[in-house]
């Protein structure tokens, strides 16, 4: 059976994306938590539950949520970046918590704390990943480029601090990390302010 359709009209359907921009959530989750951790690295206070809680919640969950939202928008870079660094924070919290779990000690399956070589390897791989991600940022705004190159430097400084055992290098890394976190906070808040006002008030 054959049907003939005549005078068919073509209509253009425009679908508008009304979902929010997830990048500020991810950038602020990363930035604030990074500043707090690196205040510790700079020697201002010892590692404590505040850093672990922030690493799990705002550093981890917020960035993973941002990653899922970026996925729904079809943004591969945002998906990989926020997802990876969100899971980085979770892995760092686990590295600090697992050796101190009492029930593992009583069951005879306690894991030893990561030694300096293991931690240096861990930090170096994250530095390498960040450096390669920086290449992708060369097509993005300058603020994102600053965040990624400074984060790569931070990871490599922390790697050097672990290998050498130098408190000075770790302290320098801490101050550099504070700058990295502040850069992420600035870009995140700038995007919120610019979008709210409907024009570019703060450059990114």
Curated annotation (Swiss-Prot):
Keywords: Cell membrane, Membrane, Transmembrane, Transmembrane helix. The chain crosses the membrane at residues 19-39, 42-62, 78-98, 116-136, 143-163, 167-187. Coiled coil: none annotated. InterPro entries: Gpr1/Fun34/SatP-like, GPR1_FUN34_YAAH, SatP. The keyword Repressor does not apply. It is a multi-pass membrane protein. The keyword Lipid biosynthesis does not apply. GO terms for biological process: succinate transmembrane transport. GO terms for molecular function: acetate:proton symporter activity. It is found in: Cell membrane. Its main location: membrane. GO terms for cellular component: plasma membrane. It holds the Pfam family Gpr1_Fun34_YaaH. Belongs to the acetate uptake transporter (AceTr) (TC 2.A.96) family. This is Uncharacterized protein MTH_215. It comes from Methanothermobacter thermautotrophicus (strain ATCC 29096 / DSM 1053 / JCM 10044 / NBRC 100330 / Delta H).
